[in-house]
């Protein structure tokens, strides 16, 4: 089913790891840190340059604005940058490990060309794949899958995931023909956008994913073992 492709483009949440990981682990970890980040911000702090880009001087208003962006899941590039900074500390301190599916780990290791495309920043993507919970080891052990991944794309490098032009940009950047690429995601709007430039698509059907209307029109993958 997936043997006809030389290149694979993968979504993250709901595709290679549970969709709940972001909303139940990453987002709460970030929002719990926001008050401290804002209240302790100084000109010399590492986050000062990021927070200043919001152009909100009042700390209470700034905190409320950031939390509102998170609550509404707004794909704001400044927010993504701030989240990347906070999550880096979480991963590096061992407080966060990414629960990547075992079949996805095996898939990434055995395929020659694998690229990642997520609305999360490239920095956040590299952190996630750098601190993967090892399914065959104790809870404190982690895997670094970054050496198996050929490249990363986000909304800043390529555009929104629901826009066809974004996938044309990715094809250009990786030097591949559309017919050589299979894109896997749990979001049908993203699949339709990729199909607009001729990329083959597959709908990831993982536990906890939202039901997809007209799902029968997509090639469905419950895991990556058949690829």
Curated annotation (Swiss-Prot):
The EC number(s) this enzyme carries: 3.1.3.77
Keyword Amino-acid biosynthesis assigned: yes
Note on how the cofactor is bound: Binds 1 Mg(2+) ion per subunit.
Cofactor(s) in the UniProt record: Mg(2+)
Residues engaged in binding Mg(2+): 11, 13, 186
Protein keywords: Amino-acid biosynthesis, Cytoplasm, Hydrolase, Magnesium, Metal-binding, Methionine biosynthesis, Nucleus
GO MF annotation terms: acireductone synthase activity; magnesium ion binding
Catalytic activity field: 5-methylsulfanyl-2,3-dioxopentyl phosphate + H2O = 1,2-dihydroxy-5-(methylsulfanyl)pent-1-en-3-one + phosphate
Record localization: Cytoplasm; Nucleus
Keyword presence, Hydrolase: yes
Single GO biological process annotation from the record: L-methionine salvage from methylthioadenosine
Cross-referenced InterPro entries: Enolase-ppase_E1 (IPR023943), ENOPH1_eukaryotes (IPR027511), HAD-like_sf (IPR036412), HAD_sf (IPR023214)
Pfam families: Hydrolase (PF00702)
Protein origin, superkingdom: Eukaryota
Pathway per the UniProt entry: Amino-acid biosynthesis; L-methionine biosynthesis via salvage pathway; L-methionine from S-methyl-5-thio-alpha-D-ribose 1-phosphate: step 3/6; Amino-acid biosynthesis; L-methionine biosynthesis via salvage pathway; L-methionine from S-methyl-5-thio-alpha-D-ribose 1-phosphate: step 4/6
Gene Ontology cellular component list: cytoplasm; nucleus
Binding site for substrate: 118-119, 161
Additional notes on this entry: Present with 2850 molecules/cell in log phase SD medium.
Subunit structure: Monomer.
Protein task: Bifunctional enzyme that catalyzes the enolization of 2,3-diketo-5-methylthiopentyl-1-phosphate (DK-MTP-1-P) into the intermediate 2-hydroxy-3-keto-5-methylthiopentenyl-1-phosphate (HK-MTPenyl-1-P), which is then dephosphorylated to form the acireductone 1,2-dihydroxy-3-keto-5-methylthiopentene (DHK-MTPene).
Family under the similarity heading: Belongs to the HAD-like hydrolase superfamily. MasA/MtnC family.
Name listed for the protein in its UniProt record: Enolase-phosphatase E1
Species per Swiss-Prot/TrEMBL record: Saccharomyces cerevisiae (strain ATCC 204508 / S288c)
């Amino acid at each position: 089913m997936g043997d006809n492709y030389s290149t694979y483009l993968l979504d993250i949440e709901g595709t290679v790891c549970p969709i709940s990981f972001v909303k139940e682990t990453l987002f709460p970890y970030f929002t719990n840190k926001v008050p401290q980040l804002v209240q302790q911000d100084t000109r010399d702090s590492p986050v000062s340059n990021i927070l200043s880009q919001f152009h909100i001087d009042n700390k209470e208003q700034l905190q409320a604005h950031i939390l509102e962006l998170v609550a509404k899941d707004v794909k704001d590039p400044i927010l993504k940058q701030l989240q990347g900074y906070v999550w880096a500390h979480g991963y590096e301190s061992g407080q966060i490990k990414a629960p990547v599916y075992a079949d996805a780990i095996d898939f990434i290791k055995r395929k020659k060309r694998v690229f990642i495309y997520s609305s999360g920043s490239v920095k956040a993507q590299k952190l996630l794949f750098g601190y993967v919970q090892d399914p065959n080891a104790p809870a404190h052990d982690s895997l670094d899958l970054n050496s198996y991944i050929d490249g990363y794309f986000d909304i800043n490098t390529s555009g929104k995931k629901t826009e066809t032009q974004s996938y044309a940009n990715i094809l250009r950047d990786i030097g591949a023909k559309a017919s050589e690429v299979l894109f896997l995601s749990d979001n049908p709007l993203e699949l339709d956008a990729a199909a607009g430039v001729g990329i083959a698509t597959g709908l990831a059907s993982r536990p906890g994913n939202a039901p997809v209307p007209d799902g029968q029109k997509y090639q469905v993958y419950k895991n990556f073992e058949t690829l």
